[in-house]
Curated annotation (Swiss-Prot):
<dbReference type="InterPro" id="IPR015424">
    <property type="entry name" value="PyrdxlP-dep_Trfase"/>
</dbReference>
<dbReference type="GO" id="GO:0004125">
    <property type="term" value="F:L-seryl-tRNA(Sec) selenium transferase activity"/>
</dbReference>
<dbReference type="InterPro" id="IPR055177">
    <property type="entry name" value="UPF0425_MJ0158-like_C"/>
</dbReference>
<dbReference type="Pfam" id="PF03841">
    <property type="entry name" value="SelA"/>
</dbReference>
<dbReference type="InterPro" id="IPR018319">
    <property type="entry name" value="SelA-like"/>
</dbReference>
<feature type="modified residue" description="N6-(pyridoxal phosphate)lysine">
    <location>
        <position position="210"/>
    </location>
</feature>
<dbReference type="InterPro" id="IPR015421">
    <property type="entry name" value="PyrdxlP-dep_Trfase_major"/>
</dbReference>
<dbReference type="Pfam" id="PF22583">
    <property type="entry name" value="UPF0425_C"/>
</dbReference>
<comment type="similarity">
    <text>Belongs to the UPF0425 family.</text>
</comment>
<protein>
    <recommendedName>
        <fullName>UPF0425 pyridoxal phosphate-dependent protein MMP0002</fullName>
    </recommendedName>
</protein>
<keyword id="KW-0663">Pyridoxal phosphate</keyword>
<dbReference type="InterPro" id="IPR020033">
    <property type="entry name" value="PyrdxlP-dep_transferase_arc"/>
</dbReference>
Length: 354
């Protein structure tokens, strides 16, 4: 979809949200995106969110909490923070494009998040994407940089068996492995899959507001030498997280509780969506909710805006960034999901599709 049309969609959604909050308050909005968001900073840290003092304090705390969250080893790994996961990806590809000619990207289900192919295009890096293991293995060589998506935008999770095969093969070809685990770092824990760094990935990035209560920031961890190079490049272009974001990320990491995700997982398993089948609506359950599909992006956007206007339900389809999947994803891990019943959500979807 054209980027200006995407911007118009975002602005329309923001205007609806703004008016609803002005007229009836925040409780009239139900953010079910799964990008929970949060910017909690304790009183002690609030006094330290200064340009140079803040990073001096929070970088160490963030490294420790980040490595713990991503199961890193402090002897060989570092963790740093960028202002967006897309910023971390951009900085990673900017750095690795100096040593490798192409990026070979495995996704459990196409398409990949647009930030990866777009970054490759900026730096003239050849890009190949596939959800076929055989195709991916045939493309990996000493001139390639390998990427794996841990969970797609619609929350399809990579199998650990496939991930390990790709990592092992890439290692044999001296191709570094980057794990895009934006939501997967937490989602895959529900399936008791191994963390990316434990599987042997050289780098992993995860988003601090996806399936957790942190700010919209990217946490990058992995091989110390690679992380230092990537962070150094990011600093040149202002891609790094500033003190307030770092402080909020530290809080989110220290307070993360997988049980909240497990509750959403159980709710998603139990929710009765048989009415969608009766109405011949294409849908699919996800680990923490469900998605509504349609061959027409325009129809999905129209439906999502109706959901927002008439029922106060915020979805990525309506309010998400340009390039995001247009399937309507309802995510029960969002904080607002606690205030809303399954029946309300299902009826809202049914009525909005009419």
């Amino acid at each position: 979809m054209d980027s200006l049309l995407e911007l118009n969609r975002v602005n329309t959604a923001r205007e609806i949200i703004r008016k609803k909050i002005q007229n009836t308050g925040r409780n009239s909005i139900y953010d079910l995106t799964g990008l929970c968001g949060g910017f909690e900073i304790c009183e002690e840290n609030l006094k330290l969110i200064e340009t140079y003092v803040g990073p001096a304090i929070f970088s160490e705390k963030l490294n420790n909490a980040g490595l713990s969250h991503l199961s890193g080893n402090s002897k060989i790994h570092n963790a740093v923070c960028f202002n967006r996961t897309s910023s971390a990806i951009l900085s990673t590809i900017m750095t690795l494009s100096k040593s490798f000619e192409k990026l070979v990207h495995y996704v459990p289900e196409k398409p990949a998040h647009p930030s990866i192919p777009r970054s490759c295009k900026i730096f003239g890096m050849e890009y190949f994407e596939s959800d076929s293991l055989e195709e991916i293995l045939s493309k990996i060589d000493e001139n390639s940089f390998t990427a794996i998506t841990g969970a797609t935008m619609d929350h399809k999770v990579v199998s650990e068996e496939i991930a390990c095969k790709i990592i092992d093969y890439a290692k044999s070809k001296n191709s570094p492995v980057f794990f895009d685990d934006a939501s997967g770092a937490r989602l895959r824990k529900l399936y008791k899959e191994s963390p990316a760094l434990e599987m042997g990935a050289d780098l992993v990035v995860t988003s601090m507001d996806k399936l957790m209560d942190g700010p919209r920031a990217g946490l990058l961890a992995g091989d110390k030498n690679l992380v230092d190079k990537i962070y150094s490049e990011g600093l040149k272009f202002g891609l790094e997280a500033q003190a307030p974001i770092m402080a909020a990320v530290v809080t989110a990491l220290e307070r993360f509780d997988l049980n909240n995700l497990k509750d959403a997982f159980e709710r998603a398993e139990k929710v009765d969506l048989s009415v969608f089948e009766a109405e011949k609506i294409e849908y699919k359950k996800t680990p923490t909710g469900f998605i509504i599909k349609n061959s027409s992006e325009e129809k999905l956007i129209e439906t999502a805006l109706k959901l927002l206007e008439n029922y106060g339900i915020v979805t990525i389809t309506a309010a998400g960034m340009p390039g995001a999947s247009k399937n309507i994803r309802i995510d029960f891990c969002s904080k607002d999901a606690e205030r809303i019943s399954d029946e309300y959500v299902i009826n809202a979807v049914l009525n909005s599709l009419k």
